[in-house]
UniProtKB/Swiss-Prot annotation:
Keywords (A to Z) from UniProt: Aspartyl protease, Cell membrane, Hydrolase, Membrane, Protease, Transmembrane, Transmembrane helix
Gene: lspA
Disulfide cysteine pairs (residue numbers): none
Organism for this UniProt entry: Bacillus mycoides (strain KBAB4) (Bacillus weihenstephanensis)
TM region(s), chain numbering: 55-75, 85-105, 124-144
Biological role: This protein specifically catalyzes the removal of signal peptides from prolipoproteins.
Record: active site: D111, D129
This protein's record includes keyword tRNA-binding: no
Main subcellular localisation: membrane
Catalytic activity field: Release of signal peptides from bacterial membrane prolipoproteins. Hydrolyzes -Xaa-Yaa-Zaa-|-(S,diacylglyceryl)Cys-, in which Xaa is hydrophobic (preferably Leu), and Yaa (Ala or Ser) and Zaa (Gly or Ala) have small, neutral side chains
Annotated PANTHER family: LIPOPROTEIN SIGNAL PEPTIDASE
Entry GO CC: plasma membrane
Protein name: Lipoprotein signal peptidase
UniProt GO molecular function: aspartic-type endopeptidase activity
Amino acid sequence: MIYYVIALFVIAIDQISKWLIVKNMELGTSIPIIDNVLYITSHRNRGAAWGILENKMWFFYIITVIFVAFIVFYMKKYAKTDKLLGISLGLILGGAIGNFIDRVFRQEVVDFIHVYIFSYNYPVFNIADSALCIGVVLIIIQTVLEGKKAKE
């Protein structure tokens, strides 16, 4: 299915970008892309979003395996007839596996996209995080659209 190709693409781009950061940047260094807006910053995270559950790797291993199994099951069952859901789940699957690879092989997640939104210093994130968020937003959009169709 094409949705697995989307997941593989996310994993590849995520892992290549993280490898480039690890090989070419010292931890904590930052390269401005757009001053006061976007930076490439070498950062490591031993937890989840905003560093929560730091150093709880076994928790993340177990949760991720269960989550990935659920996503694959859901893709097989529902994505065949729903293109937007399939794309969303492919992005989520790729993001989950991308960060899982980091946790297994590095015991931390490599983050590097650093954004300031209206002077808010947003936590540093990566391609896998972005794919997860985009996938979730697409599922929310789909749910809203389906709710509107059901009312009509």
